[in-house]
């Protein structure tokens, strides 16, 4: 994808400008989102057109013009090619997700992680997704595993509305339980009531870690997502174990989910609690 896009752009905007373009882009449904560096922003329409020419399934291209930020983890987007439309339908793992890329946070780059988590959930488990968004983790789990309940908390009203829609269109109304409230309040109501907790909000997960522990029913699993500096793998696990030691539990495994910057990684730690 990277080489192909740069090759398409070089004769249009020049080799130097093409080289500066971050050529990996996210595809969400029929929408593409790309980061266009400042030095190449004047060529943004050419970048958008090149993406659409390279991928005929894409109907709209947006440039990300701000980092992911704020309580709802949103990013400012500017339409640079195709339809001026931000609502789409994304298909993944046999599931359907309706969403507005300007109103909610959604990353297609987490698709493999969603599948991995679903593969770990056992039949009959009670799962608490503390930061559910449009319901992606919750719905993939509920589609894959029999007889589960997935309590799904979200504070962004737009994301919550799309979660309701996605639960309906994936026919999971009795399995995924949507809750419009802060995860801390939901954790208090679910106290000692679940077997597994998902914490896919790296920026703030540690603020809610004690609440996650308190929601476990005598033991279970927490999947904790964090942003960490890129260091040696043995130093990562040592630092994590040292940070989490006061809370109990055992870090059974960890993995790199994705790169989020030149020096930052998103990691997930699979933590087991034998008793609370």
Give names to the regions the model predicted.
Residues 1-276:
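SAM-dependent transferase fold signal centered on methyltransferase-like domains
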């Amino acid at each position: 994808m990277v080489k192909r896009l740069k090759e398409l752009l070089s004769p249009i905007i020049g080799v130097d400008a093409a080289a500066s373009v971050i050529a990996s882009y996210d595809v969400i449904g029929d929408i593409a989102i790309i980061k266009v560096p400042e030095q190449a922003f004047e060529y943004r329409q050419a970048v958008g057109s090149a993406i659409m020419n390279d991928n005929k399934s894409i109907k709209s291209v947006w440039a990300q013009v701000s980092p992911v930020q704020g309580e709802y983890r949103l990013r400012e987007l500017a339409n640079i090619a195709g339809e001026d439309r931000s609502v789409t339908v994304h298909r993944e793992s046999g599931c359907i997700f309706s969403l507005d890329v300007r109103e909610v946070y959604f990353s297609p780059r987490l698709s493999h992680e969603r599948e991995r988590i679903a593969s770990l959930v056992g039949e009959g488990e009670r799962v608490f997704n503390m930061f559910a968004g449009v319901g992606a983790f919750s719905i993939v789990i509920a589609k894959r595993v029999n007889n589960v309940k997935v309590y799904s908390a979200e504070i962004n009203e737009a994301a919550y509305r799309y979660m309701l829609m996605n639960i309906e269109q994936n026919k999971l109304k009795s399995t995924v339980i949507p809750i419009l409230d802060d995860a801390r309040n939901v954790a208090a109501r679910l106290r000692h009531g679940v077997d597994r907790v998902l914490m896919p909000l790296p920026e703030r997960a540690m603020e809610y870690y004690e609440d996650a522990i308190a929601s476990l029913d005598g033991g279970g699993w927490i999947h904790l997502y964090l942003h960490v500096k890129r260091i040696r793998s043995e130093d990562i696990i040592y630092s994590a174990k040292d940070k989490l030691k006061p809370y109990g539990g055992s870090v059974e495994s960890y993995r790199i989910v994705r790169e989020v910057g030149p020096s930052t990684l998103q990691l997930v730690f699979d933590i087991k609690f034998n008793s609370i």
